């Protein structure tokens, strides 16, 4: 019997299985009453009547709005997946916060705001290159990740069964699990890409709510924002910011795979992390997708083995280059039909890595984001497991920095994002799965400064904006040649004019036209 099967019978170190509900929801809403009534509108504070902070004007309990516009792409089923019309399979009513208030009970502020009434603009946190961090900043970041792997999430839980098993076998035991802060981060990513469960051994794989479409950029942006806020609260530092890894080195080595950062390779088994790294003991969750499909169940947070990277045999593979970043940032269209992995001249598809960096489609080539995941290999190679590796955090922080730079350069209107006929989950107004309370793609289609953070980074400008030396030299040489040609032409015309003045009278053709007459 595989370790996973045993795991369904035992509690795990990071996630303790409890009676609960399915989906990623606040622990306080995981009661039979809340699930039967399909309402998650918790009170704020001790006063039972203060639902959603209504007594302070922070919010109200309202009907969930879900996008019903048509989608395209390979997912052709209807009413078969609990993520359709998210989150209405679970809750019809949730807190709708007003102004700058946010959170499942409107007890938080929107990203970028602070104060008792969320009335003050918060100074943006600055995401820096991980190689530029001071030793103290580096230790704070790595230590926060390690603490997040061990500390149970204070507010949210994960599901252990699909939607038809929501209340357990007897209808009175909602199925959910407590989980560590970091494993919760991993589970969110897994849940967004998992297969549709149709029956034992009958997965429907043509579905992905966070990749292969426009939502790739907004989904991962919100994913990072949630982790960043969780880590800020975990270590008690509101100015803490996630760093980024500038992977555009063009090299065939991972410069963050060191014991000072995310761990070097173990000498006796290069697929494992060096014992000198704190991450050598990290175990993965949500890695056994085929087993979940066979059992018709969900990842329950059970640990399934050590974190792995495997660059062996990939010495010929190189990371993206600065030219790739420049080419990608020169693409002016955010996305193009069919808004999928075969879209061409799409900034989103080039950044995600299904197009070449210049926007042309080549099914044999990976670029940018996809290339880096493939380069790292191991746990990082598959979407459902990739977030287990903490490199995922800094990889996606840099990907978001590229997206943010594009947003600043082109300032796209909201309708640059398709309102309909993107793959399921990728329409502009779709609630991103499985975030709760609901948040649409459109709400994250902003520049980072509007969300309370920014990047300390200088990304390469396009060739059109700043010509390189070869281009500049060609322009100068061309101008000189043109000037010389013009000088020769003028000299020749002057020579002909002078010659004409000495033509003998016998060859002169007289004209009766006066100078004052029109030609």
UniProtKB/Swiss-Prot annotation:
Cellular localisation: Melanosome membrane; Melanosome
Signal sequence coordinates: 1-23
Lumenal, melanosome side: 24-472
Topology of this chain in the membrane: Single-pass type I membrane protein
Top-rank taxon, per record: Eukaryota
Annotated Zn(2+) A binding sites: 189, 211, 220
Record topology, Cytoplasmic segments: 494-519
Cofactor remark: Binds 2 Zn(2+) ions per subunit.
UniProt pathway: Pigment biosynthesis; melanin biosynthesis
UniProt xrefs under Pfam families: Tyrosinase
Amino acids binding Zn(2+) B: 369, 373, 396
SUPFAM superfamilies linked to this entry: Di-copper centre-containing domain (SSF48056)
Post-translational modification: Glycosylated.
InterPro entries per record: Di-copper_centre_dom_sf, Tyrosinase/Hemocyanin, Tyrosinase_Cu-bd
Molecular-function annotations in GO: copper ion binding; dopachrome isomerase activity; oxidoreductase activity
Keywords in alphabetical order: Albinism, Disease variant, Glycoprotein, Isomerase, Melanin biosynthesis, Membrane, Metal-binding, Signal, Transmembrane, Transmembrane helix, Zinc
Known function: Plays a role in melanin biosynthesis. Catalyzes the conversion of L-dopachrome into 5,6-dihydroxyindole-2-carboxylic acid (DHICA).
Name of the featured protein: L-dopachrome tautomerase
Species of provenance: Homo sapiens
